Amino acid sequence: MLHVLSVGPSHAAFTVEAAMATMKKFHSIVGEKPAQDAEAPSVDDPNVGQIRADDKEAAHAPANAETNNEEANPSDGAQAGVKKIEAVTLSWTRGTAIWFLTLVNDFRLSMYTSLNAYATSSFLGHSLLTVINIVSYVMGGSVYIPMAKALDLWGRAEGFLLMTFFCILGLILLASSQNLPTYCAGQVFYKVGFGGLSYTWNVLAADVTNLRNRGLAFAFTSSPALISAFAGSKAASDLLAHSTWRWGFGMWAIILPVVALPIYGLLAYHLRQAEKKGVLVKETRDWSITPKTVWWAIMEFDLPGVLLFAGGFVIFLLPFTLAATAPHGYQTDYIIAMITLGLALIIAFGFYEMLVAPVPFLNYKFLIDRTVLGACLLDMTYQVSYYCYASYLPSFLQVVYELDVATAGYVTNTFSVVSFVFLFFAGWLIRWTGRFKWILWVCVPLYIFGLGLMIHFRQPGGYIGYIVMCEIFFSVAGSVFILCVQLAVLASVDHQHVAAVLALLFVMGSIGGSIGSAICGAIWTSTFLSRLERNLPASAMPDLSLIYSSLPTQLSYPVGSATRTAIVEAYGYAQARMLIAGTAFMVLGFIWVGMMRNLNVKNMTQTKGNVV
């Protein structure tokens, strides 16, 4: 175990050094935009969105002005969190900007992907993977809008620290859980925390980069995945062999504060520097806990809307996964009650937001912009499609293709490795052309093509190389989706609304992930179990429930035995139907891309200070 734990820091150090060196080269090529040389937007561009044109018109100044007092100070009228990050970027140096943009950690995600199936199996909950995903994704999605308001009102540093706390709490619960409900609760805090960190990181990336360079910035923040995708899978394998899956979560409760607190310190330090330089005037606000401030917080963060949103989607989606194992299927009384109540809560959420909420959960100004709406729907559709088949992929590779944990992790993490290369390539194309919509027209059919091939190849007896080939197709298209939908929503708003519009995008993605997990769970429970019942030999029937609920039990049967062959056949039958569902949903992507305007981000600017 000591050997395994020593893997992380060495790889992390190498990753940071390599990423910093790469970013230095990036700066030497791209250059750093001085505070006084902000790029001017193209006022003649007919594709400029209505939201952006209305909000940014007064903020734009000529690029060739010798002095620009507006660029020297944060935006007037901006919220406190926006003013703080603009002040930070106006005061920090090139070295800290490089350091900040390269400090990323993907190691824990690689380990989590490999360990999750074993953790749930220890509670006989392997078949409930999608149930846990539904709850955690919906709860994670419900915090993005309040998180956006917190980032704008309080600051990026404070939001980052809060999400770090949730991460650590979730990791502790996961590592110490003794039953499935505790593990599920840990998953909720884990997804809320790391989802919030990811969201905060994306907001910070938007804060310190211009739109034309944002693709390159995202590519460089993905560079550590070249190391963590392999090292994380290997570390997870060694933990399972020599220790326990619990250390795969527990170690991060120790490591994460060491990695995260310097980022908070960096932001807080430069905020103080900005205050000393007079770039930011410190604002005072009474945060004492009184009935008035509590009521203000409830309304400002729309907690009733959050509860209706989270409760409605969780209660509505769970029955589709649970129905197959209910006594009377969809005719079971509690299944009917959950679907009815969940749908009622979702409808109530819509009416509450339109008619009652003083500060709505969703900003309807964004939803009437066709580019923002198209990008959000494309992201949601992509997440639905992906999670239709992804939840049981690591288990499938180990049971059907007889891969060990590390090798299965390498295949599963193909996305992380390939995305860096193609994000960099797509980033350069966007920087050169200023356009991104045409790239989406290429990637949507590529993703569907990969899914179609996977329906054929992801079957028992196939060649693993074809699986990897299809994963590469997914990775190329999927990574570009993530980049382009972010560019689309960011290009449609000004800096004041960056956090809010990214929150909307993340919410739609979380809804898509939860819907995809519900579809995956419904297919799994209605096909995998029935095929086991049909094909298992009589000698294995007493262990049907254990086989269905535990990955180690499935792997315990020798390859070629009648029981293992029945399990393999059931996996292939279920996976094909999951992929068919994912392919069918992704066809909607053509409609959503068609909705988006062909924006040119080459001459747009949103940010101030030492940005790239």
From Swiss-Prot:
One Pfam family hit: MFS_1
MF-aspect GO terms: transmembrane transporter activity
According to the UniProt entry, which residue ranges have a biased composition of type Low complexity?
A: 60-72
Segments in the Cytoplasmic topological domain: 1-86, 149-156, 209-215, 268-302, 356-370, 431-435, 485-498, 597-612
Instruction: Tell me what induces its expression.
Output: Expression is repressed by iron.
User: What phenotype has been reported when the gene encoding this protein is knocked out?
Assistant: Impairs TAFC-mediated iron uptake.
Q: What mutagenesis or variant effect is reported for W247A?
A: Decreases the uptake of triacetylfusarinine C (TAFC)
Locate the region Disordered: 55-78
- Subcellular location(s) of the protein: Cell tip; Cytoplasmic vesicle membrane; Cell membrane
Q: Which InterPro entries match?
A: MFS, MFS_trans_sf
Q: What highest taxon heads this organism's lineage?
A: Eukaryota
Membrane protein topology class:
Multi-pass membrane protein
> What's the reported outcome of changing A119D?
Decreases the uptake of triacetylfusarinine C (TAFC)
Span-the-membrane segments of this chain are 87-104, 128-148, 157-177, 188-208, 216-236, 247-267, 303-323, 335-355, 371-393, 410-430, 436-456, 464-484, 499-519, 576-596
- Supply the alphabetized keyword list: Cell membrane, Cytoplasmic vesicle, Ion transport, Iron, Iron transport, Membrane, Transmembrane, Transmembrane helix, Transport, Virulence
Annotated family: Belongs to the major facilitator superfamily.
| Its job | Major facilitator transporter involved in triacetylfusarinine C (TAFC) uptake. Can also transport ferricrocin and coprogen, but not ferrichrysin. MirB plays a crucial role for virulence in a murine model of pulmonary aspergillosis, indicating that TAFC-mediated iron uptake plays a dominant role during infection.
| Protein name in the entry | MFS siderochrome iron transporter B
Q: Which gene encodes it?
A: mirB
